[in-house]
UniProtKB/Swiss-Prot annotation:
The gene is ligA. DNA ligase that catalyzes the formation of phosphodiester linkages between 5'-phosphoryl and 3'-hydroxyl groups in double-stranded DNA using NAD as a coenzyme and as the energy source for the reaction. It is essential for DNA replication and repair of damaged DNA. Belongs to the NAD-dependent DNA ligase family. LigA subfamily. HAMAP family: DNA_ligase_A. It catalyses: NAD(+) + (deoxyribonucleotide)n-3'-hydroxyl + 5'-phospho-(deoxyribonucleotide)m = (deoxyribonucleotide)n+m + AMP + beta-nicotinamide D-nucleotide. It holds the Pfam family DNA_ligase_aden. One of its GO terms (molecular function) is DNA ligase (NAD+) activity. Its EC number is 6.5.1.2. Zn(2+) binds at C464, C467, C482, C488. This is DNA ligase. One of its GO terms (biological process) is DNA replication. NCBIfam families: dnlj, PRK07956.1.
Length: 741
């Protein structure tokens, strides 16, 4: 029997006794085939495991975004999607150096379909950060006060409104006339659905007294009653029925024939705006009142709140009415009411700092723990997985849950403190499974009253189940790790898989499965081997062609993809090397600084001396800290690793990085340092302002620094800047330079 238990896996998923069941991998997401790794809690992830998890989350979220925003056919529940996003964000927060260039944190929606013409949004349609607890909301208020430099007792009002589960739409009015309607798309480019939007009764065609340009944004949705009636009508006529009101609304709005949309009972709530030529009001509340005057429908549950406790009270009031509203909502959105403060707070890459979505909780379920399996990850971590009797949690059938590590099974956390009141987990137990706050299904509780007689404590292995090597647990480490290294089949192939992954060289036709097969056959052992396949096996690579599913065309396509990858961007090659602490974001930073691999390697060689200018230059790159720099230097100067890199460079010619374009502000392209106490803005606001103007903000003064902004108490940084001949200005001069005064 395999470690997957008495199940077999087919193209449609997990099968047993002739019945198809939904299989979820350790991420809790439908994958079709079992994954080889199990995942630990974010706080227990190693660097390598975190890198691998971020790659997998990126792929899963990209697929989910396309299904939801473009195809109107999501396979994940909202709770599962939110949990994926939250886990991704939590890993990035713990390992900022690993943030990928295609990070889901920087993505909004999905690329628009080719079915409709494209519309570039004048102001991006961003998503919202999520909150899942009362404490998250209090922290949200605290962050805003800290950013704005406001006292804890300073008045600060918010609006609270239901989060409608529909399709986001932007309506552009020019001289009061509706001229364009566009979906969110990927946030920057959406789909032109103007003709269809004109058929929705809640959307005015003309606005009296509106500014010359006004983009009104809101949500298209369908009521429960209208959804039921539509599905009944569709079933009678043999048409497509919809899984839920959100899918029905999205599918109805995105019809090629506007008359079909006209026949669908769509509704629209207005709640935001994009481009606007003149302000409508000074607050969010007053702006919504103006929308109502224009003829838009505003959700009647929208209220103004004076404190976080008021916000939480409204959250509970809305949640209590959720079942009787007659339309789907999945949380409550809070927005800072003062529009001038919204402007000061600004935006992160994909979300505003002044708003947050407080999501409703996911479901819990009880089921029986049938087995505990041990899986070996990329770094050798031995991770336990709970095999469960299938149970529905949050709308998805769950059959696996993470058990994190041996401490978690024994009922204690990584510090030795008891969890679950110190109750251990045993095979045969009835356990409570949940998915809130993390994509991986977890076990919240154990029902000791139902524990089978004779259930034994779980004996965690001290040797690797894959290769038999010792699996010691180092002091301070939360997990046991296989000591077999590359002789362990569960670890050896992972570096190659990372090298060809989507964020790295992304070689079409050479995915994880193919890498595993080629490795087992002895065809590839390191990245350079990929680029010598044709030379070593000849034009035909007959061994490949003889395999099922391969032929002349597919083999040639693989060779062509490999040849294309020879000139992959320098940043992708660097990321593909899988250097600890060097994620996609860090790879891009390094590539933009050094431009070529040759220049990087020369700098690394010189930076071995940590008193050298090369070391200081490396640390001066904004976003590169000592841990990251030391890992880069140590890895690339290690003899075996450098030899492997040199063999790779003999086969490829990475495309040099292109220095990023900067704007025309006075500080664009310059490196700034802030020091001392700023009196008119917080340090975070100053940094955000400088970066928005195209400047780089460093944490320390060096020869590369162009300008030091010094407030009271500047200290040693100001002294060093003066010694280096760097221009030093005060906060007032900075505000003038930044156009704030």
């Amino acid at each position: 029997m395999s470690k997957d238990g008495p199940f077999r896996f087919g193209a449609r998923g997990l099968w047993t006794s002739g019945q198809a069941l939904l299989f979820l991998d350790p991420l809790g997401v439908w994958m079709g085939t079992p994954m080889n790794d199990t995942y630990v809690a974010v706080e227990a992830l190693s660097e390598a495991a975190a890198r691998k998890e971020l790659a997998r989350l990126s792929e899963l979220l990209a697929r989910a975004n396309a299904e939801y925003h473009r195809d109107d056919a999501p396979s994940l529940s909202d709770a599962d999607y939110d949990a994926l996003k939250q886990r991704n964000a939590a890993i990035e927060a713990r390992f900022p150096d690993l943030k990928r260039g295609d990070s889901p944190s920087d993505q909004v929606g999905a690329a628009p379909s080719d079915t409709f013409s494209k519309v570039t949004h004048a102001v991006r349609m961003l998503s919202l950060a999520n909150a899942f607890s009362d404490e998250d909301i209090r922290d949200f208020d605290t962050r805003i006060r800290r950013f704005l430099g406001l006292a804890e007792d300073a008045p600060l009002a918010y609006t609270a409104e239901p989060k409608i589960d529909g399709l986001s739409l932007s309506l552009r009015y020019e001289h009061g006339t509706l001229v364009q309607a566009a979906t969110r798309g990927d946030g920057a480019v959406g789909e032109n659905v103007t003709a269809n939007a004109r058929t929705i009764d809640d959307i005015p065609h003309r606005l009296d007294g509106a500014p010359e340009v006004l983009e009104v944004r809101g949500e298209v949705y369908m009521s429960h009653a209208d959804f039921a009636e539509l599905n009944a009508r569709q079933a009678e006529t043999g048409g497509k029925t919809f899984a839920n009101p959100r899918n029905a609304a999205a599918g109805s709005l995105r019809q090629l024939d506007a008359e079909i949309t006209r026949a669908r009972p769509l509704k629209f709530f207005a709640y935001a705006w994009g481009e606007i030529s003149a302000p409508l009001a000074e607050t969010q509340t007053e702006t919504l009142a103006r929308f109502r005057e224009f003829g838009f429908t505003i959700n009647p549950l929208t209220v103004r709140c004076e404190t976080p406790e008021d916000m939480l009270a409204q959250y509970r009031a809305i949640e209590a009415q959720r079942a009787t509203l007659g339309y789907d909502i999945d949380g409550v959105v809070y927005k800072l009411d003062d529009l001038d403060l919204q402007r000061r707070l600004g935006f992160r890459s994909t979300t505003p700092r002044w708003a947050i979505a407080h999501k409703f909780p996911a479901e819990l379920a009880w089921t029986r723990l049938e087995a505990i399996d041990i899986q070996v990850g990329r770094t050798g971590a031995l991770s336990p997985v709970a095999r469960l009797a299938p149970v529905t949690v949050g709308g998805v059938v769950v059959s696996n849950a993470t058990l994190h590590n041996e401490d978690y099974i024994q009922g204690r956390d990584n510090t030795g403190a008891p969890i679950r009141w110190g109750t251990d987990i045993r095979v045969g137990d009835w356990v409570q499974v949940y998915r809130a706050g993390d994509v991986i299904p977890k076990i919240r509780d154990v029902d000791l009253s139902r524990r089978p007689e004779g259930a034994a404590p779980f004996d965690f292995p001290t040797t690797c189940p894959e290769c038999g090597s010792d699996a010691p647990r180092e002091p301070g480490d939360a997990v046991r790790r296989c000591s077999g290294g590359l002789i362990c089949p569960a670890q050896a192939v992972e570096k190659l898989k990372h090298f060809v992954s989507r964020g790295a060289l992304d070689i079409d036709g050479l995915g994880a499965k193919q890498v595993e097969q080629f490795y087992r056959d002895g065809w590839i052992a390191e990245p350079a081997d990929i680029f010598t396949l044709r030379a070593r096996f000849g034009q035909g690579l007959q061994q490949l062609k003889n395999r099922e599913g391969w032929g002349d065309k597919s083999a040639e396509n693989l060779f062509r993809a490999i040849d294309t990858a020879r000139t992959a961007p320098f940043a992708k090659v660097l990321f593909g090397l899988g250097i600890r602490h060097i994620g996609e974001s860090a790879s891009s930073l390094l590539a933009n600084h050094y431009l070529t691999m040759e220049a990087l390697l020369a700098a690394v060689d010189a930076a071995v001396d940590e008193t050298s200018d090369a070391w200081a230059d490396l640390l001066n790159i904004d976003g590169v800290g000592e841990v990251m720099a030391r890992a880069l230097v140590t890895t690339l100067t290690q003899e075996a690793e450098r030899a492997s890199v040199n063999r790779l460079l003999a086969q490829i010619d990475p495309a040099p990085a292109t220095p990023p374009q900067v704007g025309d502000s006075p500080v664009a392209g310059k490196t700034l340092v802030f020091t001392g106490t700023l009196e008119t803005m917080s340090r975070a606001e100053a940094k955000a302002t400088a970066e928005a103007l195209g400047a780089k903000v460093a944490g320390s003064v060096s020869a590369k620094t162009d300008l030091l902004i010094a407030g009271p108490g500047a200290g040693s940084k100001a002294t060093k800047a003066e010694a280096l001949g760097i221009e030093v200005i005060d906060e007032d001069a900075w505000r003038v330079l930044a156009g704030l005064a």
